[in-house]
Amino acid sequence: MRSINQLLKQASLSQKSQYNFSQTNLKKVIAEIIPQKQAELKEVKEKYGDKVVGQYTVKQVIGGMRGMKGLMSDLSRCDPYQGIIFRGYTIPQLKEFLPKADPKAADQANQEPLPEGIFWLLMTGQLPTHAQVDALKHEWQNRGTVNQDCVNFILNLPKDLHSMTMLSMALLYLQKDSKFAKLYDEGKISKKDYWEPFYEDSMDLIAKIPRVAAIIYRHKYRDSKLIDSDSKLDWAGNYAHMMGFEQHVVKECIRGYLSIHCDHEGGNVSAHTTHLVGSALSDPYLSYSAGVNGLAGPLHGLANQEVLKWLLQFIEEKGTKVSDKDIEDYVDHVISSGRVVPGYGHAVLRDTDPRFHHQVDFSKFHLKDDQMIKLLHQCADVIPKKLLTYKKIANPYPNVDCHSGVLLYSLGLTEYQYYTVVFAVSRALGCMANLIWSRAFGLPIERPGSADLKWFHDKYRE
């Protein structure tokens, strides 16, 4: 097995970059990499600028542009069979090679990757050392204080507001502290330097969002009794602590959850919305508030709670100890009534989501006796084979949402309307990394064309 240092050196050589493994200041590392990536982008435009990317149909234009390559995101891509690949690394590789909360522990109870590590990877393209992750952890701790005026703003929000509405509003409230907005308004920043205040705002937002999200949780579900931050904990572990979860298993779960949900190409609703709004030079607070609003949509961020509700309904009707035939019959009933079985199938993947496997491994070790988890795993074995018997269902494999909500529920986070906030805390990593690189690349405002129905008739009528 290759050591992490061997992997780091190989990654550096393969990308032909002069990477300083002793440098723990992320901004300085990025500043060194930006000219190389700008040169690479220039080369791509000069060499391939007139090449045809692909053809697309009227059906794709009307159908949400699915499958059309219309964006550039250098952070991750989704392979139909390997799942999400972050800067060249798969989910299993990230679990193996990214630093953990306890670097000395070799047991399976301490094997979830730290989100600090995956953010470093997204920003630099390089696997970080423990020292680099530790430096980033301390930087986020130093930036993570939420001023009392913002705390009061959240605590004065009506508790019947959806938690995602609260999060979006809190991000907009924090926008008054945007460094980019201030510099741009004063005319003190040039285009080539946009990335620097975007970096500062993005790092502040990432540092503060676990605190903001925890305040929302305690306000809405725990009588507004807040828990102070713990400076000894990492970004994800501290988030769990501030929500009120002190068990090691919950902290480990949140570390893994925030890592594997952090990015998913550039075309999903939250990432695309953040990029689109940011392309107008809206600062990171404005941009990610918009992305959060997209994530709140039932078709994007609510899938995991739909799976949980489906499974709870199944348990209410059938119990947890059932036969495979009981599951098959229930699926038949669901499909015949015109509904879908949530948690199965994916827009891109054509095999079981590696993020699902990641959570299965976690729960088999930490929650091996949990009856709901056992039932979920039984369903994941039975349902895909059953769905394949329906001619219109070609992709029946479990996705990440099949497991994530049930996992949180089994660990005691039972307020499922809050789950999308946890998702939003994670997705801030990818969205902010994309924003910083969009400004570093000098990408323009996004402005596709559109067509009315008459245009289609006039163009294609025989």
Swiss-Prot record:
Keywords: Cytoplasm, Cytoskeleton, Mitochondrion, Transferase, Transit peptide, Tricarboxylic acid cycle. It is found in: Mitochondrion matrix; Cytoplasm; Cytoplasm, Cytoskeleton. SUPFAM superfamilies: Citrate synthase. It comes from the Eukaryota. The keyword Transferase applies. Its EC number is 2.3.3.16. The active site is at H300, H346, D401. Its main location: mitochondrion. Residues 1-21 form a transit peptide. Pathway: Carbohydrate metabolism; tricarboxylic acid cycle; isocitrate from oxaloacetate: step 1/2. Belongs to the citrate synthase family. This is Citrate synthase, mitochondrial. It comes from Tetrahymena thermophila.
